[in-house]
Amino acid sequence: MLTSGLTNAPITKLLLIYTIASSIALSILDIKHLASIHVSPHLWPYAQFWRLATWQLAGFTNSTEALFAAMLAYHLRVVERAWGKRKFATFIISTLPYTSLLPPLLLVLLRPLTLYKLNYLPCGPTATLFALLAQYHAGIPHTFRYRISTSTSTSTSTSTSSANRDTDASGRGEGAQGKHLTLLLSDKSTTYLVAAQLALSQFPGMMLPAAVGWVVGVAWRAEVLPVPSARWRVPAWAVGEKEMGRRGTQGGEGGERYEDLRRRLEGEAVAAAAAASGNAGSASEASGQRQRRREGGIMDRLRAL
């Protein structure tokens, strides 16, 4: 059964609130000009390199982008439920250097290739959201699928027959006097539609962080993303969890229960090994007795001769 709302998704809830609150703060404080990046003049000649670290942490500069970013973050809550809040927070923090530094650096490289037309990088956590979207695409299966069909014909009867032919598995067909197009969609299609709207909101500037975020997410999932330590995790106390014991059990009654189960299994293993060795000893003793009887029978026959 699907869980509604932001239940069991505290990190997603925090991300959603931060996205909206930071966007509102940019408007109230009138500091939108400090959030985005223009290669010229911000990076040079002004050398405002601090923007490389703050452009993604700031909110969005208009309400449309903030709305679609909040909707996308809400749809991505299922990733946190599937992973757990500790792994979810670890992913965001470990990919943050790449999603923050790669888009501005690529913008600097692409600017001369586009005849200095590509000069603007919109602010907002777009790259992080699309890195999470890559995990949503790869790890979350669809719940249901549906088809949307369109048809055109010259008469009502041909329209009816063409609509009936739209339900075949191939999704392609052509009636005697009508044509139709069938789109196969799923419950995840609305999430991709929201993401596409966000990526195209300030074309082409917003496309760059969206593409970089997707590539970073795919690289992280394929384990080709260079990270300082692949085993590093956010501390459990940082996300409200308890530290796991040496044997992977938590303290308290749960730990005692698992410890009792471990001791019982070890006792059963020892008993089974002892029984197996006892059976082997009994079998060897019985074979020795049979050998002695056979030798005794041979000696009796020799004496009789």
Swiss-Prot record:
Component of the DSC E3 ubiquitin ligase complex composed of dscA, dscB, dscC and dscD. Residues 152-175, 273-305 are annotated as: Disordered. The lineage of its organism: Eukaryota, Fungi, Dikarya, Ascomycota, Pezizomycotina. Keywords: Endoplasmic reticulum, Membrane, Transferase, Transmembrane, Transmembrane helix, Ubl conjugation pathway. This is DSC E3 ubiquitin ligase complex subunit B. It is found in: Endoplasmic reticulum membrane. It comes from the Eukaryota. Component of the DSC E3 ubiquitin ligase complex which is required for the srbA transcriptional activator proteolytic cleavage to release the soluble transcription factor from the membrane in low oxygen or sterol conditions. Required for growth during hypoxia and triazole drug susceptibility, as well as for virulence in a murine model of invasive pulmonary aspergillosis (IPA). It catalyses: S-ubiquitinyl-[E2 ubiquitin-conjugating enzyme]-L-cysteine + [acceptor protein]-L-lysine = [E2 ubiquitin-conjugating enzyme]-L-cysteine + N(6)-ubiquitinyl-[acceptor protein]-L-lysine. Pathway: Protein modification; protein ubiquitination. InterPro entries: Rhomboid-like_sf. It is a multi-pass membrane protein. One of its GO terms (cellular component) is endoplasmic reticulum membrane. PANTHER family: RHOMBOID-RELATED PROTEIN, UBIQUITIN-ASSOCIATED DOMAIN-CONTAINING PROTEIN 2. Residues 294-305 have a biased composition (Basic and acidic residues). The keyword Transmembrane helix applies. Its main location: endoplasmic reticulum. Its EC number is 2.3.2.27. Residues 152-162, 273-288 have a biased composition (Low complexity). Disruption phenotype: Impairs growth on solid media under hypoxia and leads to triazole susceptibility. Impairs virulence in a murine model of invasive pulmonary aspergillosis (IPA). Signal peptide: none annotated. The chain crosses the membrane at residues 9-29, 52-72, 90-110. The keyword Flavoprotein does not apply. GO terms for molecular function: serine-type endopeptidase activity; transferase activity. The gene is dscB. Disulfide bonds: none annotated.
